[in-house]
Amino acid sequence: MFKKFDEKESVSNCIQLKTSVIKGIKSQLVEQFPGIEPWLNQIMPKKDPVKIVRCHEHTEILTVSGELLFFRQRKGPFCPTLRLLHKYPFILPHQQVDKGAIKFVLSGANIMCPGLTSPGAKLYPAAVDTIVAVTAEGKQHALCVGVMKMSAEDIEKVNKGIGIENIHYLNDGLWHMKTYK
């Protein structure tokens, strides 16, 4: 999603949100990520300005005080950015890939089923369309944020094809966009 993303070319406008809209977004985030509720006031303080950065391809990025926190496409579910995920790793369920998949994931490739079922990988139960953090064998922080294209049981049974769609990874355009004022 952010492979060819460039801050100067891809951003179309930025809108400061009203408090009523912010409350709606917060309740949507709590519904989507139940573990985030105790930390939500720390992530999104009440007095800090909350803005939506609108980008090409119907992508919206939620920012608080210039810090990029969540993104979504076409009014879909919110996904945390990797910077936020590194601070609060418990927001998303995790899947682990083996060492051989690291360079492909960091170049933006989708995660294939064999990379999730081989020795060194750990596949945790997850349903289709679940947003997950993908970590690597022997690494502490997440490599990418992805969407499960198959359930964990189907990945183990079929062991072919795309298991997780890579939507945001380290060193992509969104990662290089540090803050937005």
From Swiss-Prot:
Coiled coil: none annotated. PANTHER family: MALIGNANT T-CELL-AMPLIFIED SEQUENCE 2, MCT-1 PROTEIN. Imprinted gene expressed from the paternal allele in fetal spinal cord. Belongs to the MCTS1 family. One of its GO terms (biological process) is formation of translation preinitiation complex. It is found in: Cytoplasm. It comes from Homo sapiens. GO terms for molecular function: RNA binding. Residues 92-171 form the PUA domain. Keywords: Cytoplasm. It comes from the Eukaryota. GO terms for cellular component: cytoplasm. This is Malignant T-cell-amplified sequence 2. The gene is MCTS2. SMART domains: PUA (SM00359). Its main location: cytoplasm.
